[in-house]
Each structure stands twice: as C-alpha cells, then as structure tokens.
Amino acid sequence: MSDSDSDSDYELTLSANALAALEEFKREEQQHQEAFQKLYDETDEDFQKKKKEEGMKLFKEDWQLSQFWYSDDTAAILADAILEGADENTVIAIVSAPSVYAAIQKKPTNEIPTEHIYLFEFDKRFELLAGRDHFFFYDYNKPLDFSDEIKGKVDRLLIDPPFLNEDCQTKSSITAKCLLAPNDNSKTKKGVFKHRLISCTGERMSEVISKVYSDTRITTFLPEHSNGLSNEFRCYANFECSSWKFAS
C-alpha cells in the first residue's frame, strides 16, 4: 500500500469518526429538546415541583453563548449572599447567572424573604425557570434595552457577564448601574444594609472591574463551575458576609 493510500484511508476513518460523533451529538440534542418540550406539556404543579428538584439539570450549557453553570455549592453560596438579611420589600436582580436563580428557587419558601427576584438573561429558555413575570430578556450589547419599570428599583444585584473582555464587562456595568437604586445606606427590616452588588468574572478582568464598579473589592470567595473552567474566576463585591471577606 502506498503512503497516499494510507493517508487516504486515515482521512476516511477520521471523517467517519467525526461523522459518528456529530450524529451522536445531534441525537443527544434531540433527546434534550424533547425532554424540554415535555416540561411545557406538564401541569404547572408538576413543573414547579420538577423545577425545584432539578434546577439547572433541566438546562444544557450552550458554549456558543459562553454558558458555564456554577457548581451547586457555588450557586448556593452566591444565593445565600444575595438573600442574606433581605426582607419582603427587597428587590433583587440576577443578571446572566441563571444557576444562582435556580439555587434560590431550590430553597424552602420560608428561606426566600422576597418575591421580587428577577432574572435577566439572553437565553429565552430561562423564562421557563423564572416565569414570565420575573424574566427579562437581556442582551448586553443593548445594555439599556429593557422595561423602564425596574430601572433604578433594584436593591441587590448579582452579575456574571458572559464574556471575559472589556467591552462585555463595561456594557454589562451600564445595565447594573441603571438597575440599581441609589445607595442611601438604608437598612432592611432585619437591620442589614439593603444595597449589595456582586460581580463574578475572570481574575484577568480585575482592572476593568475596579474601574466600572469602584466601590467593589475582590473577595476571598472563589467561584467554581460544574464542568470546570480554565479561566481563574473571582468574586467581587461591595460588602462582606458570612461566606467571604475582602481579600487583603
């Protein structure tokens, strides 16, 4: 057999393997879509129960949208931090971090102090998670393109912009500043400062974060992702809590 024949056979084998992998991927996608569609057909009671139990397991990551879900522990810690000391009047926005929203929903009802918790997300699948009344379609390229009714009304905000570049971080910060109510150092009925801001993003974005959120500092908390992520992630916040302190 000539070298050219060997090369040709190798290319054919490689192509066959690639084709098989593609077909398997398509099958998995189809199965996932069918399972997802089934959720729409269930009664509201059945779905609410499943949503609480399954959380982010219902939603497959779309890497083209730079979707990387937090680990369960990380999502739970961030959920606790944003809820800590809130009362029934506290307004909370979760921006581009649906796994934190899912972690909040998993909590017992008596551990969720407010009904005013909203999800801002580009992926419209998550309207199913949050519900129509608590979901805002959000595209960071249009940072002010959402309902005026919530602008300047948010007391606490957690944001995890999808891309680790200055453009995305800066545009996302425009959204955050538009949503947040002025910080007047008022406290909730539980005696905790009402205003809180959390930004989770890559360590290499630290200079950008210090510029766009001048009142935040890097914390000791290290966010982790369920499927691993090569980029070092950090949590920036303008407050300390039971889960973290400001890093020295």
From Swiss-Prot:
Keywords on record: Cytoplasm, Methyltransferase, Transferase
InterPro entries: DNA_methylase_N6_adenine_CS, Efm5/EEF1AKMT1, Mlase_EEF1AKMT1/ZCCHC4
Keyword Cytoplasm assigned: yes
Compartments reported by the entry: Cytoplasm
Lineage top rank: taxon: Eukaryota
GO biological process: methylation
A GO CC annotation given for this chain: cytoplasm
Signal peptide extent: none
Documented EC number(s): 2.1.1.-
Listed GO MF terms: nucleic acid binding; protein-lysine N-methyltransferase activity
One Pfam family here: N6-adenineMlase
tRNA processing listed as a keyword: no
Function, in words: S-adenosyl-L-methionine-dependent protein-lysine N-methyltransferase that trimethylates elongation factor 1-alpha (TEF1 and TEF2) at 'Lys-79'. Required for replication of Brome mosaic virus (BMV).
PANTHER family on file: EEF1A LYSINE METHYLTRANSFERASE 1
Any further remark recorded for this protein: Present with 3060 molecules/cell in log phase SD medium.
Protein family (similarity comment): Belongs to the class I-like SAM-binding methyltransferase superfamily. EFM5 family.
Protein name per Swiss-Prot or TrEMBL: Protein-lysine N-methyltransferase EFM5
Top-level taxonomy: Eukaryota, Fungi, Dikarya, Ascomycota, Saccharomycotina
Gene: EFM5
